[in-house]
């Protein structure tokens, strides 16, 4: 079950595998190592890092996370999530880009997606990470457009809703235009676990839109398309707000699972953002095993 009362509370996650990301304007940096510090300037090609998180596992492994802000410093315009792990008490670190889309070209880009504010928690073995994902060109600052109130981004069955790009409004349009598009399409998990498409793209009548494949990371291919649903060139696009994006690692931060999107933001909220740093996993009592992250709401300059 999920609950929101100043915190995000998560249930269990299915066992999943690591992501395979498409290359758009940038190429995902190769995994690498650093000494003494997890995020030295230049790590993975990024000059700037912000919003650190750190947890220690039962076996002593350290797992750290941060925004990779590339050559920028603001809260939007092409941020990605870097995670680094150490098994020798911080002497050496091995990093990977856990959340990465590549539409920023690995530099600050006002029109790109942004992963921001990663937070970590652990039960001692599994590491859980929550982050905010903004669609193309959208963020509270340092992006082309501000996020909008008026919609949660999901339907009543907690399915991600989408609008079809047209000649008048696209996934890269001003968010004032995007918010008024017809969000009559949605994603439904494919009941066939052996199918190529993890999600089915459906219209308002429940008919599957033919010719497209959507994987577990929201990459969409087919009909001449090879992009991600959150990128500016997608043929279908989400509501222009932020989305809470949760993954887990069962191997000490080396690889990360397919994401789960949490439908907890109110339509009246401009953004609901993960309180960065770390969460907790309740270890005793009735709610043993419950995963908890703090969060805050930001609407028109008010932070609650």
Give the residues covered by each predicted segment.
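Sec-dependent signal peptide cleavage junction
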Residues: 9-25
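Hydrophobic helical h-region of N-terminal Sec-dependent signal peptides
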Residues: 4-8
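Asp-box/BNR beta-propeller blade signature and adjacent active/binding-site loops
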Residues: 22-304
């Amino acid at each position: 079950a999920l609950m929101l009362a100043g915190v995000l509370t998560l249930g269990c996650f299915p066992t999943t595998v690591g992501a395979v990301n498409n290359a758009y304007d940038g190429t995902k940096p190769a995994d690498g190592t650093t000494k003494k510090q997890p995020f030295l300037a230049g790590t993975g090609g990024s000059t700037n890092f912000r919003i650190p998180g750190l947890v220690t596992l039962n076996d002593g492994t350290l797992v750290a996370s941060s925004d990779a802000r590339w050559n920028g410093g603001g809260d939007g315009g092409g941020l990605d999530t870097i995670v680094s792990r150490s098994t020798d008490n911080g002497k050496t670190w091995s990093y990977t880009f856990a959340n990465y889309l590549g539409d920023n070209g690995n530099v600050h880009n006002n029109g790109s997606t942004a992963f921001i504010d990663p937070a970590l928690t652990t039960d001692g073995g599994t590491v859980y990470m929550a982050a905010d994902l903004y669609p193309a060109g959208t963020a509270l600052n340092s992006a082309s457009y501000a996020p909008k109130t008026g919609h949660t981004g999901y339907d009543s069955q907690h399915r991600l809703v989408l609008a079809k790009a047209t000649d008048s409004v696209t996934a890269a349009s001003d968010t004032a235009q995007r918010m008024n598009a017809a969000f009559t399409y949605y994603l439904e998990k494919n009941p066939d676990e052996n199918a190529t498409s993890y999600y089915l793209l459906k219209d308002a009548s429940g008919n599957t839109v033919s010719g497209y494949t959507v994987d577990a990371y929201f990459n969409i291919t087919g009909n001449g398309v090879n992009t991600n649903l959150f990128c500016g060139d997608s043929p279908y696009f989400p509501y222009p707000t932020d989305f809470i994006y949760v993954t887990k690692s069962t191997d000490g931060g080396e690889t990360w699972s397919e994401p789960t999107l949490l439908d907890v933001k109110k339509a009246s909220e401009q953004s609901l953002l993960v309180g960065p740093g770390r969460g907790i996993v309740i270890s005793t009592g009735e709610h043993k095993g419950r995963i908890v992250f703090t969060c805050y709401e930001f609407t028109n300059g008010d932070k609650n």
